[in-house]
């Protein structure tokens, strides 16, 4: 399977499995997991070593499965994501919600079955490392932080 550092797994509304991978400096990935696919680590990476030298891997290799999204140039330090399937935020139906240590909560519009485009940044003003997001029974979001004063946050429209 060749995955570097799985940060989170989630299923989308079609039952497909997605993996968020914490890459080396830069190069965090979102992968759609398919049986028998090779995601390339350590031979393929978009990131670089922490001393800013290029990583061993190359960008693309025939036969390897490329990520759906790659986060460059800096790392997001992604957490456990969720695809939104609630009612509280109807415009987000099917969108990917991705918590991050460094960028808050990212919302990716899902078009053609895959998240893409530029994310909307949410909760960045909290200055907290976001670890996980889950969708509650009424569509509210529950976001877990992991600082020493960590908390479980409930996010509803207007909050």
Task: Give the location of each predicted region.
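Short, exposed beta-strand-loop hairpins at the edges of beta-sheets
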Residues: 141-146
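Repeated scaffold domains used in trafficking and secretory/extracellular systems
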Residues: 130-132
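Flexible gly/pro/ser-rich segments immediately N-terminal to CXXCH heme-c attachment motifs
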Residues: 124
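Beta-propeller domain segments
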Residues: 4-120, 128, 138, 150-151, ...
């Amino acid at each position: 399977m060749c995955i570097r550092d799985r940060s989170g797994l989630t299923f989308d509304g079609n039952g497909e499995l997605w993996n968020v991978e914490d890459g080396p400096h830069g190069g965090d990935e979102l992968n759609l997991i398919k049986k028998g696919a090779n995601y390339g680590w350590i031979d393929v990476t978009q990131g670089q070593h922490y001393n800013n030298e290029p990583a061993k891997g190359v960008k693309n290799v025939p036969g390897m499965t490329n990520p759906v999204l790659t986060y460059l140039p800096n790392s997001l330090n992604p957490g456990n994501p969720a695809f939104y399937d609630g009612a509280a935020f109807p415009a987000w139906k099917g969108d990917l919600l991705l918590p991050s240590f460094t960028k808050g909560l990212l919302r990716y519009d899902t078009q053609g079955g895959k998240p893409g485009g530029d994310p909307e940044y949410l909760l960045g003003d909290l200055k907290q490392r976001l670890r996980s997001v889950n969708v509650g029974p009424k569509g509210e979001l529950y976001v877990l932080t992991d600082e020493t004063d960590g908390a479980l946050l409930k996010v509803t429209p207007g909050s």
